[in-house]
Amino acid sequence: MRKGTRIALRVLGGLVGLILLVVLGSYVVSEMRMRKHYDDVRGTVVAIPGDSASIVRGKVIATLYGCTGCHTPTLAGMTMIDQFPFARLPSSNITSGQGGIAATYTDADWDRAVRHGVRRDGTPLFLMPSHEFNRMSDDEFGRLLAYVKSVPPVDKAPGSRTIYPLARVLHTFGAPLVPAEKIDHSTQANPQPPRGASLAYGEYLAGACKFCHGADLGGQKVGGEAGAPPSPPIGRASAVARWTEAQFFQTMRTGVTPEGRKLDPKYMPWPEIGQLGDDELRGLHLYLKQGVSQSASADR
C-alpha cells in the first residue's frame, strides 16, 4: 500500500472517529438535558372565564399564537416534523378525547406546559415555543384555556417521537430546541397593556406574529409542513409597514393585499386577526410601522 493511501486512510479513519465521538457525546449530553427535571416550576392557576365572548377571544388567541397551526384546528395534533436525520415529532392531542392530554391536565399543568415548556412529569417539552407564551398575561392565558377546554374531544393517539442524531448535535451546540432552558421561570407574566391603539398594545399583539415571521419580524422559513411558503417580512423595513391604516385593515379583514394578492388562511390567519377590534388593529399597525426594524435587505 502506498504511503499516500495509508495517510488518506488514517485521516479518513480519524474523521470517522471524530464524527462518532461528536454524535455519541451529543447523544449523552442531549439525553441528560431532555431528561432534566424542572420540579421547581409549579405552575400558576389562573381564572378561566366561561362566557362565550371569552371563548371566542380564546380562539383568536389560539390562532394568533400558532396553537391551531401546530395542533391543527381540531387541536388533535399532527406530525409536525418527519425528517431524517433531524427528528420525527408529533404535536400532542390537547383535547379531552382518547389519546389527548386535556382530561388529565390540571390548570397548573397547562401553565407549566404552555408558559414554561415543562411536562407534567417535570421534563422539558421539545420545540414547544413556550418562550413566546411566557409573558402572556394571566387574563389572556385564561381566555386561551377557556377555548381549549371548550373544543370537542377527538380520539387520536399521538405518533411516536424520535430525536435523530442531527437534532441532538444541534441541541448540544446551542440550538434552542428545548425552550424551557432559555426561559426565566421566576419571571411573572406581563400585565396586559390597556387594549387600544397604542404602541405598547401593538407590541403585545405582535408577540404572536413572531412565531411565523421571526423574532425581528423579518420573515423566515416556517417548519412543520413540506411545501409551506416562507413567511414574509412585516417589520419596519417591509412593504407591510408602508401600507396605510386603511390598507392594513382591508388586508386583515378581506385577505386581499393592496397589491391584489390573496392571502391563504391556511398559512396567514387573517380571518382571526380580522376579528380584532379597530383600536387593536391600529395598535398592531402602529407597532409594525414604528416598533420593529430589520435590515432593509429583508424587504423582499
Regions found by a protein language model. Give the residues of each.
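Gly/Gly-Pro-rich "capping" loops immediately C-terminal to redox-active cysteine motifs
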Residues: 44, 48, 74-107, 124-137, ...
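Short, solvent-exposed interaction modules
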Residues: 112-121, 176-192, 251-252, 256-258
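N-terminal type II signal-anchor transmembrane helix
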Residues: 2-38
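C-terminal capping alpha-helices of c-type cytochrome domains
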Residues: 27, 31, 106-116, 132-158, ...
